[in-house]
Amino acid sequence: MKIVIDLMGADHGVLPIIEGVSRALENKSFGAVLVGDKDKATPFISKELASKVEMIHTQDYIKMEEAATEAIKRKESSIYLGMDILKNGADALISAGHSGATMGLATLRLGRIKGVERPAICTLMPSVGKRPSVLLDAGANTDCKPEYLIDFALMGYEYAKSVLGYDSPKVGLLSNGEEDIKGNMLVKETHKMLKAYDFFYGNVEGSDIFKGLVDVVVCDGFMGNVVLKTTEGVASAIGSIFKDEIKSCLKSKIGALMLKNAFDTLRQKTDYAEYGGAPLLGVNKSVIISHGKSNARAIECAIYQAISTVKSQVCLRITKAFESLKPSASTHQSDQQDA
C-alpha cells in the first residue's frame, strides 16, 4: 500500500508530519511518499527513516491565505504533485495543508464517484457511548440542496458500516428539533426524501451528536463546520478550566492524581489528534484532510485512518451503494477527467 503525505502548508511545519510518519511506520507496513521541500525535511529524517520513504522535492505549496483555485494552476505545488501520484497508482493521500485546495484538486483530478453530486468532509465526533459519531458535511459545501444531503447520508452510512465496522448504522438529520415539522426548508425537504431509506432515524438536535443517539449525523457544510469548530473550542476550554482548577490547591492536585485514568479517557475522547483526519468522501480514491494544527499523533492516526479506508474499499462500497440505493444515481455522470 502506498500513501502520499503532503509535507507542506501545515501550521507547525514539516517536523510533526515527519514524526507522525515515522511513528506510523513503526506500527504498520506501508509505502510512504513524502512530497515537499527536501531542504526543510532532510534535517528531520533519520537514515533509518530515509530508507523507508520516498521523497518528492518541491518548494511550492498553496498558502492558507491563497485562493483554493490557485492549486489548479500551480502544477509544481506539493498538493498538485501529491494528487497526481495518487491518481496514477498510489492508494491514499493525507494533507494538513490548504483544505480547499485539497478538496478542489481531489474532485478535478480524481473525479467524483458516479452518482455523487458533491463530495463531503466526514469527521468523527466524541460520544458518551463506546464509539464516536460520524458527522458530514463538515465544511466542503456551505450551500446545499436536499439531493446533496441524501448523498451525504448514503456516504456516511457506508463509511460507518465498512470502515468503522458499525452494524446497521442509523442516520440522523441535524435540525433545531426532533419533530418532523422542525427545520428550515432544506431540512424539511431532505427529511421527506430520507424517509425512503431504512437507515434513517429522523431529525436529531445538536446535543444528540454527543449522546450516541445515532451513528451518522447529516447536515450542510456550513452548519457542520460550525458544529465542528464549536466542539473543538468547548473541548479546549474545558481542558483549560480543569488545568487551572487542578493547579489551584493541593487537594485538587491529589484528586486529579486519583482520577488520572478518567482524565486520560476524557482527553482521548475529546482530542482531535486521536481521530486523525477527515476523509473526503465521494471522490474515486482515499483522501484524508488533516487539521492544519496537526501534531505528530494526529498525522500518525490519519495514516491509520487512510489504511483503514483503503483496506475496507470504501470508495468501491460507496459506488455500489449509489448504484443500488440511490434511485437517481444512474442519471448522473462521473466527473472523472484529466486536468
Swiss-Prot record:
In which pathway is this protein known to take part?
Answer: Lipid metabolism; phospholipid metabolism
Q: What is this protein called?
A: Phosphate acyltransferase
**Reaction(s) catalysed (UniProt annotation):** a fatty acyl-[ACP] + phosphate = an acyl phosphate + holo-[ACP]
What family classification does the UniProt entry report for this protein? Belongs to the PlsX family.
Top-level EC class as recorded in UniProt: transferase
What EC designation does it have? 2.3.1.274
Entry-linked Pfam families: FA_synthesis (PF02504)
A GO molecular function for this record?
Answer: phosphate:acyl-[acyl carrier protein] acyltransferase activity
Subcellular location(s) of the protein: Cytoplasm
Tell me which NCBIfam families the record gives. plsX
Summary of subunit composition and partner proteins: Homodimer. Probably interacts with PlsY.
- GO CC annotation: cytoplasm
Protein purpose? Catalyzes the reversible formation of acyl-phosphate (acyl-PO(4)) from acyl-[acyl-carrier-protein] (acyl-ACP). This enzyme utilizes acyl-ACP as fatty acyl donor, but not acyl-CoA.
**The organism's place on the tree of life at top rank:** Bacteria
Q: What organism is the protein native to?
A: Helicobacter acinonychis (strain Sheeba)
- Name the InterPro entries on file: FA_synthesis, Phospholipid_synth_PlsX-like
UniProt-listed SUPFAM superfamilies: Isocitrate/Isopropylmalate dehydrogenase-like
Q: Which GO terms describe its biological process?
A: fatty acid biosynthetic process; phospholipid biosynthetic process
Key words, A-Z = Cytoplasm, Lipid biosynthesis, Lipid metabolism, Phospholipid biosynthesis, Phospholipid metabolism, Transferase
Q: Name the major location.
A: cytoplasm
